[in-house]
């Protein structure tokens, strides 16, 4: 085939597309741009076919979204080259030349070459292919062959079979996106509540003969005019968003990625407020639109199903005067029932809980609730009957989480609790929450519910035991609903939330003790986590202060339960067994303190030594065997380590009190999720730096560090580290660490050259880059001014602890204890330190500056880093 110069055609097409985009920038009307881009490509393809002819009798057809008449700025151009018979060698060469020319034009075609028989066979086996072919549109070539394809596709179309297949396909797609429209980085095309859901509804309606547009579907009685208007608006919003994503990135990008969200907000003219980022406001708009589509999708799919598979209502069974069981779905007896008696808007959810045979609500009921939600007004909220009903929903033995989720989706919960409405769809760009505030809140309620279920008792033995003994544990659900209710308002959200829950308790007639409990829980829902993860639990004063703040055993149990549920509902990455152990340790210590066991340091020391001695005897050591080692340990050591750790150290060190070589011993932690590491060697300024460098290079995440120097100058350091995700064989890892870390400590200089910092996963790095945490460092004398307390907050990154350790060494600051609190991609660490540099204002300022630089990633890069 002679060479064809495509440049003039390509330039005309590119100029026309640029003009269309410029027009869109002046008047952002999505349908106009999509239609114009489609028209431009249609014209270019018809000209191209004149230059690169189709095989004789063949047809060039647009399929998929392009066939539907929509073309996004950087979407593939989906084409079907339809042949009247299997291709000859000449036909194959013609097709090959045409496809090559498509690429030369810069169109990125998604093409298939098929005969009519091929199309029918592929459509039978793949609902996606069938759908694409149903939307085929003639572009060039044989119109007769195109009509034969249209006729064949319509002839084989079975509306009922098509509906079932598309519903299964949609369910599978939703499952790939975790069945939620509230993803951090939603795909505006494929995620639940996005463009694809809208297309599926229209495909189902079209196949069943109910129309091709929202107006036609409404005329067929499947939609009300207001629902059609809402869906049309949502469709236009999602189309524009997808267009903006393509234009912003210059590629086919349908995901609302973190690093695109600020730019998108700017395109939409959304500005940050004093308390909310512009990107958070943008995403809240997205989530509200996706929620609307998700809800109307449920109603429409059920409506189409009822039309396609009609069944008589004669098998409906009355539940009461207002509701009936219609094919295992809750159905309202009178269509205007919610308008006549708005109290039913809450009672419907209570009935769902009380009738486990119901699998959902009928489309009629869902639609009636949706259209009557405006009846929940101030008068409705003041009605004592409605207040009692709401509490009853929280007090039921089953269905609480399901119905709260359904109430949120149908906009009933946000209307009943207007303060809840403000957090619906509110994203938290704080690097550790992976859900919107409302979804996180419902996840916390779900976690509390799991504590009550016998089938989950083995997962949470202490929590299950405590909630079983807690009087009126439904109060925890109230606290959970309100614990983050004031997020995004500015100020202390815990304090503001406490005021809101106090008002709720008064309005709903909670007795004073219960009202005081939920207010305490909301006000102090972060307290237990902070103390457990940031304070030295071996210090009796820390425990006494915490116990005094909590006040009694009921509050302590409730706070423990809410704290565990809260952390576990934040992100799958935030919770780990080490945090669970810290919280359980604090609970048991505080429980003892509240029970009158106010042990002073001397009592704690004596009891701990006695228990450690008992454990060493069980290991076969005589009492006199440990004396040489214990004589080198001061009171601080015994107070900072529990009896099990002391006995473990003793078993390995009693016979080598002053070894020539470093001693490293490692064992799996008792909770089975990490490693406990002991390092015993002659003390040296860079010891902590070298050890942290090794952990970082091996992707071992330090959770806790206790640094101790014996009376005769040996370092006895203890670490809790978590192995990389997916590493199952902890004993093999322990053996490896024992060998490698000992080698590293023998030659720390070589270690500096060997250390290569690990990298964060790409998505985490992107998120932390777009929404960084402002580095903070606060240095203050500890309670008894024996040492200093350094609190730091920053975006997590590989090598951060190592960088801080280098700053300590460079400034002559000794680490006594480290409490590492990692919240997703945010760290809030506490270090107990000492050193003469901290006693002088000038050197103290230099140290703090160096710490801030290290937190920001600006520390001077040495070869070791």
From Swiss-Prot:
Region (Uridylyl-removing): 319-675
GO terms classed as biological process: regulation of nitrogen utilization
ACT domain mapped to chain residues: 676-762, 789-865
Basic residues composition bias: residue spans: 751-767
Cofactor(s), by name: Mg(2+)
A Gene Ontology molecular function term of the record: phosphoric diester hydrolase activity
All residue ranges annotated as the HD domain in the record: 437-559
UniProt entry keywords in alphabetical sequence: Hydrolase, Magnesium, Multifunctional enzyme, Nucleotidyltransferase, Repeat, Transferase
Reaction(s) the record says it catalyses: [protein-PII]-L-tyrosine + UTP = [protein-PII]-uridylyl-L-tyrosine + diphosphate; [protein-PII]-uridylyl-L-tyrosine + H2O = [protein-PII]-L-tyrosine + UMP + H(+)
Record InterPro entries: ACT-like_dom_sf, ACT_dom, HD/PDEase_dom, HD_domain, NT_sf, PII_UdlTrfase/GS_AdlTrfase, Polymerase_NTP_transf_dom, UTase/UR
Uridylyltransferase as annotated region, ranges: 1-318
Activity control, per UniProt: Uridylyltransferase (UTase) activity is inhibited by glutamine, while glutamine activates uridylyl-removing (UR) activity.
Keyword Membrane applies: no
Region called Disordered, residue ranges: 747-767
EC code(s) of this entry: 2.7.7.59, 3.1.4.-
Function: Modifies, by uridylylation and deuridylylation, the PII regulatory proteins (GlnB and homologs), in response to the nitrogen status of the cell that GlnD senses through the glutamine level. Under low glutamine levels, catalyzes the conversion of the PII proteins and UTP to PII-UMP and PPi, while under higher glutamine levels, GlnD hydrolyzes PII-UMP to PII and UMP (deuridylylation). Thus, controls uridylylation state and activity of the PII proteins, and plays an important role in the regulation of nitrogen assimilation and metabolism.
Family: Belongs to the GlnD family.
Domain notes: Has four distinct domains: an N-terminal nucleotidyltransferase (NT) domain responsible for UTase activity, a central HD domain that encodes UR activity, and two C-terminal ACT domains that seem to have a role in glutamine sensing.
Protein name: Bifunctional uridylyltransferase/uridylyl-removing enzyme
Organism: Bordetella parapertussis (strain 12822 / ATCC BAA-587 / NCTC 13253)
Gene for this chain: glnD
């Amino acid at each position: 085939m002679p060479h064809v110069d495509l440049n003039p055609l390509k330039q005309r097409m590119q100029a026309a597309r640029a003009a269309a985009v410029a027009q869109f920038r002046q008047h952002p009307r999505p349908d106009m741009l999509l239609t114009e881009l489609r028209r431009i490509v249609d014209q270019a393809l018809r000209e191209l076919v004149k230059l690169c002819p189709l095989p004789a009798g063949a047809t060039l057809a647009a399929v998929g979204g392009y066939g539907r008449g929509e073309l996004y700025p950087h979407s593939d151009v989906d084409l079907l080259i339809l042949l009247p018979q299997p291709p000859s060698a000449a036909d194959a060469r013609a097709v090959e030349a045409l496809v090559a020319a498509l690429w030369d034009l810069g169109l990125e075609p998604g093409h298939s070459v098929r005969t009519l028989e091929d199309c029918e066979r592929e459509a039978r086996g793949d609902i996606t292919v069938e759908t694409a072919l149903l939307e085929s549109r003639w572009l060039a070539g044989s119109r007769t062959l195109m009509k034969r394809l249209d006729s064949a596709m319509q002839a084989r179309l079975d509306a009922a079979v098509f509906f079932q297949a598309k519903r299964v396909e949609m369910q599978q797609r939703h499952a790939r996106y975790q069945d939620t429209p509230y993803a951090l980085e939603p795909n505006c095309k494929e995620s639940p509540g996005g463009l694809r859901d809208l297309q599926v509804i229209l495909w189902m309606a079209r196949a069943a003969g109910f129309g091709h547009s929202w107006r036609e579907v409404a005329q067929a009685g499947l939609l009300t005019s207001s629902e059609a208007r809402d869906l049309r608006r949502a469709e236009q919003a999602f189309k524009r968003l997808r267009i903006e994503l393509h234009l912003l990135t210059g590629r086919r990008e349908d995901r609302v990625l973190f690093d695109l969200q600020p730019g998108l907000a700017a395109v939409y003219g959304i500005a940050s407020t004093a308390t909310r980022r512009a990107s958070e406001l943008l995403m809240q708009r997205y989530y509200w639109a996706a929620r609307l589509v998700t809800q109307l999708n449920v109603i429409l799919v059920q409506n189409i199903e009822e039309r396609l598979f009609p069944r008589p209502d004669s098998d409906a069974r009355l539940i009461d005067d207002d509701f009936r069981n219609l094919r295992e779905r809750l159905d309202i007896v009178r269509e205007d029932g919610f308008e006549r008696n708005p109290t039913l808007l809450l009672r419907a959810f209570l009935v769902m809980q009380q009738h486990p045979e119901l699998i959902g609500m009928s489309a009629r009921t869902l639609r009636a609730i949706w259209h009557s939600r405006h009846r929940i007004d101030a008068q409705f909220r003041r009605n004592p009957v409605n207040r009692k009903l709401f509490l009853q929903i929280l007090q039921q033995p089953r269905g609480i989480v399901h119905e709260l989720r359904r109430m949120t989706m149908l906009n009933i919960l946000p209307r009943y609790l207007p303060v809840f409405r403000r957090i619906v769809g509110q994203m938290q760009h704080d690097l550790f929450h992976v859900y919107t505030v409302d979804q996180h809140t419902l996840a916390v309620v779900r976690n509390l519910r799991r504590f009550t279920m016998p089938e989950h008792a083995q997962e949470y033995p202490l929590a299950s035991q405590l909630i079983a003994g807690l009087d009126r544990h439904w109060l925890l659900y109230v606290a959970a609903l309100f614990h983050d209710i004031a997020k995004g308002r500015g100020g202390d959200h815990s304090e503001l939330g406490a005021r809101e829950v106090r008002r709720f308790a008064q309005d709903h007639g909670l007795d004073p003790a219960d009202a005081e409990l939920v207010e305490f829980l909301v006000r102090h829902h972060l307290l237990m986590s902070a103390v457990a993860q940031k304070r030295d639990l071996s210090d009796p004063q820390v425990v006494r202060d915490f116990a005094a703040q909590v006040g009694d055993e009921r509050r302590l149990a409730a706070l423990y339960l809410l704290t565990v549920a809260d952390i576990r509902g934040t992100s799958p990455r935030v919770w780990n067994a080490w945090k669970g152990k810290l919280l359980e340790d604090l609970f048991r210590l505080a429980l003892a303190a509240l029970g009158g066991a106010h042990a002073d340091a001397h009592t704690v020391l004596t009891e701990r030594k006695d228990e450690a001695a008992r454990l060493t005897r069980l290991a076969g050591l005589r009492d006199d065997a440990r004396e040489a080692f214990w004589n080198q340990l001061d009171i601080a050591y015994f107070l900072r380590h529990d009896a099990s750790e002391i006995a473990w150290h003793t078993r390995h060190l009693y016979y080598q009190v002053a070894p020539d070589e470093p001693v490293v011993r490692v064992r799996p932690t008792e909770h089975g999720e990490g490693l406990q590491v002991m390092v015993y060697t002659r003390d040296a300024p860079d010891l902590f730096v070298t050890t942290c460098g090794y952990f970082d290079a091996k992707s071992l995440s330090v959770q806790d560090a206790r640094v101790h120097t014996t009376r005769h100058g040996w370092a006895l350091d203890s670490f809790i580290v978590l192995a990389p995700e997916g590493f199952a064989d902890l004993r093999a890892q322990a053996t490896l660490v024992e060998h490698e870390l000992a080698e590293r400590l023998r030659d720390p200089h070589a270690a500096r050259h060997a250390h290569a910092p690990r990298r964060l996963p790409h998505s985490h790095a992107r998120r932390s880059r777009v929404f960084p945490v402002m580095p903070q460092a606060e240095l203050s004398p500890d309670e008894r001014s024996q040492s200093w307390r350094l609190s730091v907050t920053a975006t997590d990154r590989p090598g951060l602890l190592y960088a801080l350790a280098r700053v300590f060494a460079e400034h002559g600051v000794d680490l006594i204890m480290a409490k590492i609190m990692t919240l997703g991609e945010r760290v809030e660490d506490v270090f107990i330190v000492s050193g003469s540099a901290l006693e002088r204002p000038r050197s103290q300022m230099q140290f703090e500056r160096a710490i801030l630089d290290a937190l920001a990633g600006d520390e001077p890069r040495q070869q070791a880093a």
